[in-house]
């Protein structure tokens, strides 16, 4: 098993190329189930979760041909001959549930194992299932599997999500794409990753109204498969945010190429509050960090507010701030598991329920730490960049699920970081 070894780094400098967004690519790969043609996806991030979902489609009978050197894949789902997504793959990644809506819409029946993935609290899929039942599906859960059938096909209806769900919105949008009639989703997620899915479906013959709003109206094709043109995955806003935090915590000027600042409004705003300034172009962001990092108050909420996937990185940054920062996590329980590891490095953090109080000017010391989930992994790496001594981050399979070549990208801008074998 691999681990990352990090030594306190001098100022970083240079450019980092931002990869395609994992959280956009996953539903777009699942979307290929709705296609009648071979789908070409470009700017695909080279991360474990993408490989897992492509393997799942291959197990269902799809022909997937990936060129990782070119960050692209082609998917032919005309050869699909299975409708059962088995536990051995689904257990490793919650996003596998994204195949539920498309398979059910295309074939009228499917079995999908209940999902696994990051251990950051309960992320129930009941909202997905309730919506599919409203569309005419009959669903039972037996022996760890979701059994879904739609004997008369899925039918459009009015769906109101009790709470905003990104994966749920994507799943139901894909199901509605092939349904009969019109589906309206109220309280839909507005994340850029959902927006891209809707835009591509819209360009593929599925009329979707209300894109970028909380109310989506999807005019289904009545079972007619889609002609999907080649497309490129949007840049990863969480990866970009992570490297911006690397610049801020090491007080280094970095340029992110291929980043979309329009997707990073809340992150850039909080970094500005903490003293950083930015030069922004259509496809790049350069951070000009402050010599003094200011304290901050952060509340995680759904897009376009501050993303929960950036909470851990900002918590690491706040350990070096001037003053006391307050970080409140409103979306997931158990998403402060990185706190105990940062405390082992010397961070002065106290927890009260879903609120972390971070006292700045912590003198961090390198030690052995364990990653507990994907974004916690990156927070420990950020801390390691400014900690005295050597920091060894273990269980980085979490990191590899969502970051493409993180240690290589940091090495290229001067960080002292290496991937080693246990």
Curated annotation (Swiss-Prot):
Subcellular location per the Swiss-Prot or TrEMBL entry: Cytoplasm
Pathway as given in its UniProt record: Cell wall biogenesis; peptidoglycan biosynthesis
Protein keywords: Cell cycle, Cell division, Cell shape, Cell wall biogenesis/degradation, Cytoplasm, Peptidoglycan synthesis, Pyruvate, Transferase
EC number: 2.5.1.7
Residue positions where 2-(S-cysteinyl)pyruvic acid O-phosphothioketal is found in the record: 118
Catalytic activity reported: phosphoenolpyruvate + UDP-N-acetyl-alpha-D-glucosamine = UDP-N-acetyl-3-O-(1-carboxyvinyl)-alpha-D-glucosamine + phosphate
GO cellular component entries: cytoplasm
Matches recorded under CDD domains: UdpNAET
Disulfide bond sites: none
InterPro entries according to UniProt: Enolpyruvate_Tfrase_dom, Enolpyruvate_Tfrase_sf, MurA_subfamily, RNA3'P_cycl/enolpyr_Trfase_a/b, UDP_GlcNAc_COvinyl_MurA
Domain of life: Bacteria
Binding residues for phosphoenolpyruvate: 22-23
Family note: Belongs to the EPSP synthase family. MurA subfamily.
Name of the protein this chain belongs to: UDP-N-acetylglucosamine 1-carboxyvinyltransferase
Gene source species: Sulfurimonas denitrificans (strain ATCC 33889 / DSM 1251)
């Amino acid at each position: 098993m691999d681990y990352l070894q990090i030594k306190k780094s001098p100022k970083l400098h240079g450019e980092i190329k931002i990869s395609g967004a994992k959280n956009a690519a996953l539903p777009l790969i699942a979307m290929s189930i709705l296609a009648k043609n071979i789908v070409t996806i470009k700017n695909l991030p080279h991360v474990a979760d993408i490989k897992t979902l492509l393997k799942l489609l291959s197990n269902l009978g799809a022909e997937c041909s990936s060129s990782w050197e070119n960050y692209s894949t082609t998917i032919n789902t005309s050869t699909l001959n299975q409708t059962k997504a088995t536990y051995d793959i689904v257990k490793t990644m919650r996003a596998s549930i994204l195949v539920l809506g498309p398979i059910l819409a295309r074939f009228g029946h499917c079995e999908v194992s209940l999902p696994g993935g990051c251990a950051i609290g309960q992320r129930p899929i009941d909202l997905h299932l309730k919506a599919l039942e409203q569309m005419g599906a009959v669903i039972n859960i037996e022996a760890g599997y979701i059994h879904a059938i739609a004997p008369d096909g899925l039918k459009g209806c009015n769906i109101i999500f009790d709470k905003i769900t990104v994966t749920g919105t994507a799943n139901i949008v894909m199901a509605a794409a092939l349904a009969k009639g019109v589906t309206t989703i109220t309280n839909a997620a507005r994340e850029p990753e959902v927006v891209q899915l809707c835009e591509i479906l819209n360009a593929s013959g599925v009329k979707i109204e209300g894109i970028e709003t909380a109310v989506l109206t999807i005019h289904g094709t009545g079972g007619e498969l889609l002609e999907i043109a080649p497309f490129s995955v949007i840049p990863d806003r969480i990866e970009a945010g992570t490297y911006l935090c690397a610049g801020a915590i090491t007080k280094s000027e970095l340029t992110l190429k291929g980043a979309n600042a329009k997707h990073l409004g809340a992150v850039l705003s909080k970094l500005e509050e903490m003293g950083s300034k930015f030069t922004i172009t259509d496809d790049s962001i350069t951070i000009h960090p402050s010599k003094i990092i200011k304290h901050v108050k952060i509340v995680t909420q759904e897009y376009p507010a501050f993303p929960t996937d950036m909470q851990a990185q900002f918590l690491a940054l706040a350990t070096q701030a001037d003053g006391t920062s307050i970080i409140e996590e409103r979306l997931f329980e158990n998403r402060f598991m990185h706190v105990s590891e940062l405390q082992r490095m010397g961070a002065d953090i106290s927890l009260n329920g879903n609120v972390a109080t971070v006292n700045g000017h912590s003198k961090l010391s390198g030690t052995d730490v364990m990653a507990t989930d994907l974004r916690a992994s990156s927070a420990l790496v950020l801390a390691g960049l400014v900690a005295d001594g050597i920091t060894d981050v273990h269980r980085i399979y979490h990191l590899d699920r969502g970051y493409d070549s993180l240690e290589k990208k940091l090495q290229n801008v001067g960080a002292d970081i290496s991937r080693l074998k246990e």
